[in-house]
């Protein structure tokens, strides 16, 4: 439905998981309806496990396993390091390095990114940065981001 109204991509979070398992039936149906290229799956990770429903429920699914099993349902992942979200103390670079080796899909990283240096490190890994608190608080400025942006 959203694609019909010209949404370019759809982000699927908790719906990708059901009863502490990957919701393959839902994802397969969605992929058939709108195409893999329009789907981004949110990977909210806390202590190496997928969390859902506003980060309140731990599925027990290892983050690396989720990436492996979900890769063919989507074209991108939105990875959030829940422990780092909003703290502006850096994201989970080690986990992102592992995940990047597991998938050819695009990875967008959120949670804790707070410096131009970190954005450059993520870029070298082939990971996009999603910024929130660092922009909101003024720790990162748009004018500085423009200097390193490639668009």
Model-flagged regions — what are they?
Residues 3-85:
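Conserved anion-binding
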Residues 1-9, 94-129, 145:
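Catalytic cores of alpha/beta
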Residues 22-23, 51-54, 88-91, 119-120, ...:
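Short, well-ordered secondary-structure micro-motifs
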Residues 14, 87, 112-113, 133:
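Gly/Ser/Thr-rich helix-start
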Residues 85, 114-117, 137:
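Active-site environment of divalent metal-dependent phosphoester hydrolases
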Residues 24-43, 88-115:
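Alpha-helix-loop-beta-strand connector modules within alpha/beta enzyme cores
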Residues 21-34, 100, 123-151:
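C-terminal helical cap(s) of enzyme catalytic domains, especially alpha/beta-barrels
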């Amino acid at each position: 439905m959203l694609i019909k109204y010209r949404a370019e991509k759809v982000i699927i979070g908790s719906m990708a998981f059901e009863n502490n398992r990957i919701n393959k039936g839902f994802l397969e149906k969605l992929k058939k309806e709108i195409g893999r290229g329009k789907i981004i799956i949110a990977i909210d990770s806390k202590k190496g496990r997928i969390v859902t429903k506003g980060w309140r429920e731990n599925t027990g699914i290892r983050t690396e396993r989720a990436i492996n099993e979900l890769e063919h349902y989507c074209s991108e992942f939105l990875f959030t390091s829940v422990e780092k979200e909003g703290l502006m103390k850096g994201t989970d670079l080690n986990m992102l390095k592992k995940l990047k080796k597991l998938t050819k899909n695009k990875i967008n990283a959120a949670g804790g990114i707070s410096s131009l240096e970190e954005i450059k490190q993520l870029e070298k890994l082939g990971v996009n940065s999603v910024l929130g608190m660092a922009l909101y608080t003024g720790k990162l400025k748009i004018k500085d981001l423009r200097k390193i942006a490639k668009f």
